[in-house]
From Swiss-Prot:
Its main location: mitochondrion. Belongs to the metaxin family. There is a cross-link at K38, K41, K78 (Glycyl lysine isopeptide (Lys-Gly) (interchain with G-Cter in ubiquitin)). The chain crosses the membrane at residues 164-184. One of its GO terms (biological process) is protein transport. This is Metaxin-1. The keyword Transmembrane applies. GO terms for cellular component: cytoplasm; SAM complex.
Length: 317
């Protein structure tokens, strides 16, 4: 008997099954199609077989870590939400997917990762509370820098020199995109009628994050909440496909009774790697900043350092 497919994704919060855009899209598509996945909702990407989230381990042991490729694999396994779409609807799907990535994705990244208030009070707060030590000290900041670089690439050569002008232009285009989605949806349950398709999985992931998070700076969120059919659309999908998971609170850092469970593969190995990486990062920072300098001294200090590392590892068990 073949092993079950396993999906590793970011855990949930803000009333959603996942706080990550890509993880939420893949989870939603899987629910739409009824794909039999063993889902691991985690807050440490190093516990993923690819080191990134989301990631799918297929029944043959192959690891896929790009959302579109994960969905393509599910289609090959005959879990295809677009099976009944016409050629015209397939073309519309591609057009709207391109629109989402070009007009809505940059502003979503800006809203959660670049806007100072939102990042400090919402995004960094959730990841810092959910991630294990010591990842919660440095990984949110690294993720923010990566999103800033991606946003610069998305803006491309048409980027205005004035940052305020760029932000105004991005948000204007995103509002127009939301309005267009609202007009296209109309009074339908889903974008192509009574059954969900892959487009619905991606649109929902964009809209639900924007709708559910309590953002102190929510210009685009306010525009979305004025489009009542899109808000009802998100609520319908949440209640129908995530009736229990959507109500979960952000996961606290817990110490499970049995650290070697099936839900946490390679836990011991990754705990040790996490602690060592954190200690190395803090030691490197101390050396580079001049807080600590290397001098010739007796080696009596080494046992104390080793004891500290063991104590931190014990706390992670």
């Amino acid at each position: 008997m073949a092993a079950p497919m396993e999906l590793f994704c970011w855990s949930g919060g803000w009333g959603l099954p996942s706080v990550d855009l890509d993880s939420l899209a893949v989870l939603t598509y899987a629910r739409f199609t009824g794909a039999p996945l063993k889902v691991h909702k985690i807050t440490n990407p190093w516990r993923s077989p690819s080191g990134t989230l989301p990631a799918l381990r297929t029944s043959h042991g192959e690891v896929i870590s790009v959302p579109h490729r994960i969905i393509t694999h599910l289609r090959k396994e005959k879990y295809n939400a677009d099976y009944d779409l016409s050629a015209r609807q397939g073309a519309d799907t591609l057009a709207f997917m391109s629109l989402l990535e070009e007009k809505l994705l940059p502003v979503l990244k800006h809203t959660f990762w670049i806007d100072a208030k939102n990042y400090v009070e919402v995004t960094r707060k959730w990841y810092a509370e959910a991630m294990p030590f010591p990842l919660n000290f440095f990984l949110p900041g690294r993720m923010q820098r990566q999103y800033m670089e991606r946003l610069q690439l998305l803006c491309g050569e048409h980027r205005p020199e004035d940052e305020e002008e760029l932000e105004k232009e991005l948000y204007q285009e995103a509002q127009e995109c939301l309005t267009l989605l609202s007009q296209r949806l109309g009074s339908q349950k889903f974008f192509f009628g009574d059954a969900p398709a892959s487009l619905d999985a991606f649109v929902f992931s964009y809209l639900a994050l924007l709708q559910q998070a309590k953002l102190p700076s929510g210009k685009l969120q306010a525009h979305l909440r004025g489009l009542h059919n899109l808000c009802a659309y998100c609520a319908h999908i949440l209640s129908l496909y995530f009736p229990w998971e959507g109500a979960k609170a952000p996961p606290p850092r817990q110490t499970p009774a049995n650290p070697e469970t099936e839900e946490e593969p390679y836990r011991r190995r990754n705990q040790i790697l996490t602690v060592l990486a954190g200690l190395a990062a803090m030691a490197g920072y101390a050396l580079l900043s001049g807080i600590v300098s290397i001098q010739r001294a007796p080696s009596a200090r080494a046992p104390g350092t080793q004891a500290l590392g063991m104590a931190e590892e014990d706390e992670e068990e």
